[in-house]
């Protein structure tokens, strides 16, 4: 986000009480058909509400695409989310046409896309009780699993780029760049250098380790120090404060 105020407004919007603390699973159908979990999540740190996870994925859309066929490959890319396609949504993005990872993007091989949110070291000196305590690291993360496939239709590939650019131009506060006004011949040449793909999501896992299980005094101390920190710490403060605010009493 362009400012701390805007970023916190987004996070507060994400963490509505109804969305954050829905203890029901995504759905019985999802539980029966989802792949094995990729992430260890203690119950206190689980978030299962789909709208919240989607909001988080859109806010932190620069991801790690992880595949293991024919070898372990990890690529870091921006993405866009289509919430309406598939049971849990569809993620779209592109990698370099020269990237050997594209061999895994044929719709048959499993992949995990990792969305990382704010994170920070947490010092025991911030707690109200400072005996028998150790440091930790607080964070929010979402894993999306599926079987990505290359987009071979040129019009669909163009639409992916147009949507990705339009979304990020809006987030950057820019109004002067018009991708549609670029010469199509030039765009077609540039598109030869990318391998666009889409992945219908088979499973979503949300882990938000933000000290939910600690005492009120400990949580207050953590918030105080995060708020006084740098940009990274203040980003985590925004997410943590919103979570604490909407936590059931």
PLM region spans:
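A generic structural signal for short beta-strands and their flanking turns/coil linkers
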Residues: 61, 75, 87-91, 107-111, ...
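C-terminal segment of classical bacterial N-terminal signal peptides
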Residues: 20-25
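Charged, gly/pro-rich active-site loop segments
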Residues: 36-41, 118-249
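N-terminal secretory signal peptides and thylakoid transit peptides that target proteins
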Residues: 2-17
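A short mixed-secondary-structure module that forms the rim of ligand-binding clefts
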Residues: 80-123
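An N-terminal domain-cap segment
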Residues: 33-88
